[in-house]
A protein has these predicted regions:
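Juxtamembrane intracellular "pre-TM" segments in multi-pass secondary transporters
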Residues: 1-9, 179-213
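Substrate-agnostic recognition of the 12-TM MFS/MFS-like secondary transporter fold
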Residues: 9-26, 49-65, 69-80, 97-152, ...
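A single, central transmembrane helix in multi-pass transporters
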Residues: 24-28, 156-161, 200-258, 311
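Transmembrane alpha-helices of Major Facilitator/SLC transporters
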Residues: 56, 247-268, 344
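Structural signature of the two symmetry-related core transmembrane helices
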Residues: 72-87, 164, 273-289, 367-370
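Hydrophobic alpha-helical transmembrane segments
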Residues: 95-98, 102, 128-180, 250, ...
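Helix-loop junctions on the cytosolic side of multi-pass membrane transporters
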Residues: 114, 118-119, 160-190, 381-392
Length: 395
């Protein structure tokens, strides 16, 4: 008989499987859009509905994650995602189907990060667990993108059946995670007002303010570039197959894994301000992307983007969880983080969608994304400088 895996290892595997399918489904949606002759902007719309789910549900899901055992909340999130797969199988509109997957993801997310402080016993362990979880997530993004592209090129229905089975496997690993008791005293009355207070609390603490802006900027760039590069590859390099596109995207995933894995040796929770340098590298790489016209350079640039992104995002996540666990609660902290990040992403993808509809070239949209990132990093530099003299910090 095989030994039972630890709660942390079970979480890593469950997260890998769930994130694998989340990203697999985006490529399946792309195949459905291509096959159904939807408008050119429709993939961005599908991505936007996923993000919008996070924005509208954020005031409630953090409380839900803190009220109930987080391992159980992970199961609930996967079940809702499975419902989204069923809608895809029933040939519902891909935007609606992926929006339901987004609802499952918004329920799942506060629990997956919020449970980490309960499964670790020190700041070092928390940062290490964060790094591992981020690495598993990134590998899942990489593998799910390749798997989704490969399978959807062969059979959309077959790919969706596999997706449903993998969500089921993730639930089985969720069952192996030890359960906390949750806080049954938490209620949902005045959730929006309380959520606004939670945002204000985290914004008043220098580390969490800086981390929220930083993670938001990362995901704005990531989400916008993802849909932009989908359009850029056929136009600039003449690559159209889902399998080929997903393999090129794999370079970013490999870079993210590399960056996330080396981060604990470069940046700690105490030295989180060093992330600004990784952010600057990320912005410069995005701006430079508009001057690329060959496949080898594209792959190298995507790898470098991923590596800079991994070094940038992991310490920011760990710092935010460290502060949130000691203040408003882990689940509510992740809900605030999701709200900020997905608002940033929704705005970025929204601007891109409007610009494509207006006939603005893809390269101009990518350059605009890099410019937005530079503006946000300038604000973060101001936050970092101001913190030396005024804003309170939490040890």
């Amino acid at each position: 008989m095989l030994p039972k895996p630890s709660s942390l290892n079970s979480l890593y595997v469950a997260q890998f499987l769930s994130a694998f399918v989340d990203n697999m489904l985006l490529f399946i949606a792309q195949a459905i859009i291509t096959k159904g002759n939807y408008p050119v902007y429709y993939l961005a719309l599908v991505q936007g509905t996923f993000l919008f789910s996070f924005i509208i549900l954020s005031p409630w899901v953090g409380r839900y994650a803190d009220k109930h055992a987080k391992a159980s909340v992970l199961i609930h999130g996967n079940l809702i995602k499975g419902l989204g797969v069923i809608l895809f199988l029933l040939d519902c509109d891909p935007a609606l189907s992926y929006a339901v997957v987004g609802m499952g993801a918004v329920v799942y997310s506060p629990a997956k990060y919020g449970i980490l402080p309960l499964l670790t016993s020190s700041e070092g362990e928390l940062l290490k667990a964060n790094s591992y979880l981020e690495s598993f997530t990134i590998v899942a993004i990489l593998a799910g993108s390749v798997g989704g592209g490969f399978l959807s090129d062969r059979s959309i229905t077959g790919a969706l059946i596999i997706a449903a089975g993998l969500y089921g496997a993730s639930i089985l690993f969720n069952l192996l995670i030890s359960k906390d008791h949750g806080d049954r005293k938490i209620n949902y009355r005045d959730a929006i007002r309380a959520f606004a207070r939670d945002i204000d609390t985290l914004a008043s603490i220098q580390q969490s303010h800086y981390s929220l802006v930083g993670t938001g900027s990362f995901w704005l760039a990531s989400a916008t570039l993802r849909v932009a590069v989908f359009a850029w590859l056929p136009l600039v390099l003449g690559i159209t197959g889902n399998t080929e596109i997903s393999l090129i995207f794999a370079a970013t995933g490999i870079g993210l894994v590399a960056g996330a894995m080396i981060t604990p040796w470069l940046i700690t929770i105490q030295t989180y301000r060093r992330t600004l340098f990784a952010g600057i590298a990320l912005a410069l790489l995005v701006l430079a992307f508009t001057a690329i016209y060959s496949l080898p350079v594209t792959i190298a640039a995507l790898f470098a983007l991923g590596a800079a992104g991994g070094i940038y995002i992991v310490p920011l996540n760990a710092c935010l969880q460290h502060v949130g666990h000691k203040t408003i609660g882990a689940g509510k902290t992740i809900a605030v983080q999701n709200f900020i990040e997905n608002t940033f992403m929704f705005l970025g993808v929204g601007v891109y969608t409007v610009s494509v509809g207006a006939g603005i070239p893809v390269n101009a949209s990518i350059f605009a994304t890099g410019t937005m990132l530079v503006i946000i990093l300038t604000y973060m530099f101001f936050l970092r400088d101001r913190a030396k003299n005024s804003a309170p910090e939490m040890n």
